[in-house]
C-alpha cells in the first residue's frame, strides 16, 4: 500500500522533506520502510528492536494508532500517517 507520511519540522530536517511517500501493509512496515531509506531518521521513529517509542505518537488518518493495533494497524492505499513526538519542558 502507498501512504503519505507527515513529519514535524524537527524530524523533517533528517529526511529533507516534511511529507514522504511510504509503502507497507501495516504501520510498522511503513515506518520500517522509511527508516531504511532515511537511516538518520530511523532512531527518532522507533526503537532499535523495531517497536514504537512511548513518547512518539502516530496518527493514522487522524486516529491514534494505539487504539487501532499499534504498529500492526493495517494500511490502505492513500492513508495518511502523521508522526508527533512528545514535547518536554516546563
What are these regions (language model features)?
Residues 1-89:
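Ubiquitin-like/PB1-type beta-grasp interaction modules and other compact soluble beta-rich domains
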Amino acid at each position: 500500500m502507498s501512504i503519505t507520511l507527515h513529519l514535524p519540522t524537527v524530524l523533517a530536517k533528517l529526511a529533507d522533506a516534511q511529507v514522504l511517500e511510504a509503502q507497507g501493509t501495516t504501520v510498522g512496515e511503513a515506518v520500517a520502510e522509511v527508516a531504511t531509506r532515511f537511516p538518520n531518521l530511523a532512531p527518532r521513529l522507533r526503537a532499535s528492536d523495531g517497536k514504537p517509542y512511548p513518547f512518539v505518537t502516530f496518527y493514522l488518518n487522524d486516529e491514534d494508532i494505539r487504539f487501532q493495533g499499534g504498529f500492526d494497524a493495517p494500511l490502505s492505499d492513500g492513508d495518511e500517517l502523521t508522526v508527533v513526538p512528545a514535547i518536554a519542558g516546563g
